[in-house]
Amino acid sequence: VGLPDNGIFKIGDTLTEGELIHFRGLPSFSPELFKYIENDDPMKSKQFYKGLEQLMDEGVAQLFVNQFNNRRIVGTVGQLQFEVIQYRLENEYNAKCRWEPVHLYKACWIESDDEKEYENFKKRKYQYMAKDSEGRDVFLADSGYVLSMAQQDFEHIKFHFTSEF
């Protein structure tokens, strides 16, 4: 079956004739590699952001927006994905990007039943906080030690290494 898509469908969407079906969706795993991505041609900003959004929707990589400096961070499981993103942005969207290194250890989706501790955590760890493409809070630990200390200091915060929890 072919369906025209103007961007409303995502991988894993289900169509029915009225039945109420609920799937958990496809999980996103914590990436292994991280880099800042920057638009290399300000005259092509619209193409750059549209291409980046569509590539992330396809699941090529994961995009996080750092809450401290508002920079976009792409997370992947392999170096080749960065090259694929750059190639596709240039050849499919006529947009150029450049990569800048960022040292991160792990991306953890966080949640808590203790709203006060949750807000305190986000406030104290502001420089490590980001949002994923779905608007969920993500803690970007720059070392195993930082992650371990956060888990120890905030025992009511749950740290998840996949986005489905």
Mark where each language-model region is.
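Structural and coupling elements of P-loop NTPases
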Residues: 1-165
